[in-house]
Amino acid sequence: MSLPVALQLYSVRDELEADFEGTVRKVKELGYDGVEFAGLYGKSAADVKALLDEVGLIPVSAHVPLDDLVQKTEELVKEYKEIGCEYIAVPYLTEDRRPGTDGFERTIADIKKIADVCKENGIRLLYHNHDFEFKKIDGKYALDILYSEVAPDRLETEIDTCWVGVAGENPSEYILKYSGRSPVVHLKDYYMKSKDKPQKLYELIGIESGGEEAEEESFGFRPVGYGVQDMPAILDASVSAGAKWVVVEQDRPAQGDTPMNSVKLSREYLKTLGW
């Protein structure tokens, strides 16, 4: 059994900025079944929906910054509902909202409020993890605390398999841990020289932080199937957990590669597995 494959459009953000329509058409040509948004690049919901309908891509989900969702909950939920998205995902936590800070309780409270609005509008809210949620609080990972604090019918998982691996956990096992609550799984491959991740790892996705420099020699994102991940096991786990979609994401191409070629390689690899 295989699942439909979507592309997180953040992977080709520069191409979208330069030519939104042409890039969306190219994504379809590469064999993707759907897309996950990370912004609309100034386009209206109606125009985006019309383009996707014409091209034949399904609008799966949208990554929307948490603070934006807090400030404009109804507006944003209705905008992505108009496009046809089934899901909205909280994509990232700023440092003041992360586990280990006073802001984490506020994060959980805000997610609960947003989840209620999503449910009222027929949208399913997801949480997309990184590695910082694998900080233990009273012996329990913060990611698990979040999912225990918010009811399953209000918040579901969008397990990012790269960041689970970077955190030192098994991505397949984590997907299976949330069987029945894992409708969308992020397929992301990577290379990491050692088990000790660079402190400035997030600079590779455009976010400044303290610590040592992160360099391609020590860590880098890779097309799906070209890194350290056991992708067949991850795909099997996704099916077993009841996922509806898998989403390819590559934050940054490997040195010498391009974003579009990277997502092309990912899609071609998945096709070799019958996906």
Predicted regions and their residues:
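Acidic/histidine-rich catalytic cores of soluble enzymes
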Residues: 120-228
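Acidic-and-aromatic substrate-binding clefts and catalytic sites of carbohydrate-active enzymes
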Residues: 13-18, 34-47, 64-73, 95-99, ...
